[in-house]
């Protein structure tokens, strides 16, 4: 069992299987919500959303993370699922040759799982081959170091998350065709150095 769904007539909770019985932690029991973050407790709503097929398969197969830092399986909260799914769907539907791509943003508060959401989005895009490179840019060294550590802890054993010690290493990884160089964590400063060295 990877995910538990517990229901009463008035409430539904779902959570990843933490392993042993003494590892169950109420902090990781979540209410499923719709796209507008309205909680769904009604069993019919849960049956047609959370535990429907293919949604249940997708949640288990694509939206769980075996976190190496604490050895616990984690499942994404509903808003994380919707964010990661929307990002990867947008990338898969983008017509890259038209040159009209626009950026976007996902707004999460402190402690809401931004790093896991960004990692899962990056992983889904990388695994789908919808982009040659997936680059996670940070604006400061501490955030880059922490994000790299968490990305590596979230990654499957057959995935590699690349660090960039300097601009030259970043440029080398960007030019590389190696599958191991698909997912990269780097800084805005290193990326802008490449642009400056390239002449704009």
Spans of features found by a protein language model:
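ATP-dependent helicase/translocase motor core
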Residues: 1-133, 142, 146-158, 182-183, ...
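AAA+/P-loop NTPase substrate/partner-engagement loops
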Residues: 138-145, 177
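Short acidic loop-to-helix transition motifs that present clustered carboxylates
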Residues: 143, 164-172, 191
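Conserved AMP-binding/adenylation subdomain of ANL enzymes
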Residues: 157-165
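Conserved motor-coupling elements within RecA-like helicase/translocase cores
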Residues: 167-184
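Short, solvent-exposed loop/turn elements at domain surfaces
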Residues: 193-195
């Amino acid at each position: 069992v990877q995910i538990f769904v517990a229901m009463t007539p008035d409430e539904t909770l779902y959570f990843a299987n933490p392993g042993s019985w003494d590892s169950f932690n109420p902090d990781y029991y979540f209410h499923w919500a719709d796209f507008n973050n309205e909680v769904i407790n009604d069993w019919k709503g849960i049956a047609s959303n959370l535990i429907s097929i293919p949604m249940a398969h997708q949640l288990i197969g694509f939206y769980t993370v075996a976190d190496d830092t604490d050895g616990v399986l984690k499942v994404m909260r509903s808003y994380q699922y919707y964010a990661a799914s929307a990002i990867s769907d947008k990338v898969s539907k983008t017509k890259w040759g038209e040159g009209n791509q626009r950026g976007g943003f996902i707004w999460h508060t402190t402690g809401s799982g931004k790093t896991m959401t960004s990692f899962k989005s990056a992983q889904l895009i990388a695994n789908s081959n919808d982009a040659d490179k997936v680059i996670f840019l940070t604006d400061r060294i501490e955030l880059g170091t922490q994000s790299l550590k968490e990305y590596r802890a979230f990654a499957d054993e057959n995935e590699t998350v690349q660090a960039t010690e300097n601009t030259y290493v970043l440029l080398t990884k960007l030019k590389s065709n190696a599958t191991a160089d698909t997912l990269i964590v780097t800084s805005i400063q290193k990326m802008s150095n490449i642009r400056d060295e390239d002449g704009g």
